[in-house]
Amino acid sequence: MSIKSDKWIRRMAQEHGMIEPFVERQVRGEGANRVISFGVSSYGYDVRCADEFKVFTNINSATVDPKNFDEKSFVDIKSDVCIIPPNSFALARTVEYFRIPRNVLTICLGKSTYARCGIIVNVTPLEPEWEGHVTLEFSNTTTLPAKIYANEGVAQMLFLESDEECEVSYKDRGGKYQGQRGVTLPRT
């Protein structure tokens, strides 16, 4: 497996729709308009967070059960920022829609800007031939409220290309998150 460069990412996005919408350079903004960077980097793509969030709340004193998740455990927010309560988490989605090639596995890592503030981004790998908006999980590990900015960079995708195609892709096995749009809750 080899990690793919900015040239490969640009070509795959422009010719094969791997990332839509696609930003072909790294955007940082200037002066008072600085943003947390997004777009193509040397060996990855920095994704943006959309403006729709689901913030975890325990007002119903529920038990968190991944096999029987209660949608009422979240408060829906549509905003340019999301405040995550101390020691809690929120779900969001990427602005970008991904179409992963059959011979590629994509790994997501959080941006250091958030990590240095105690905000951890978690995403499972994007498997071969998976497509959809990526659901992002933000954990606030601090004892203070934490802010997430919509339409700015939140994580970096790294594309690993195999020297051979897999026998069975995510699409082949009818993965339960195939084609997801919006913030997607757990499915079993």
Curated annotation (Swiss-Prot):
Record Pfam families: DCD
Binding residues for dCTP: K111, S112, T113, Y114, A115, R116, T135, L136, E137, Q156, Y170, Q180
An example Gene Ontology molecular-function term: dCTP deaminase activity
SUPFAM superfamilies: dUTPase-like (SSF51283)
Keywords: Hydrolase, Nucleotide metabolism, Nucleotide-binding
Entry annotation: catalytic residues: E137 (proton donor/acceptor)
Catalytic reactions on record: dCTP + H2O + H(+) = dUTP + NH4(+)
InterPro entries referenced in this protein's UniProt entry, alphabetically: dCTP_deaminase, dUTPase-like_sf, dUTPase_trimeric
An individual GO BP term: nucleobase-containing small molecule interconversion
EC number: 3.5.4.13
CDD domains: trimeric_dUTPase (cd07557)
Statement: the UniProt record of this protein carries the keyword Hydrolase: yes
Pathway participation: Pyrimidine metabolism; dUMP biosynthesis; dUMP from dCTP (dUTP route): step 1/2
NCBIfam families named in the record: dCTP_deam (TIGR02274)
Assembly with partners or alone: Homotrimer.
Function comment: Catalyzes the deamination of dCTP to dUTP.
Family: Belongs to the dCTP deaminase family.
Name by which UniProt lists this protein: dCTP deaminase
Species this chain originates from: Pseudomonas syringae pv. tomato (strain ATCC BAA-871 / DC3000)
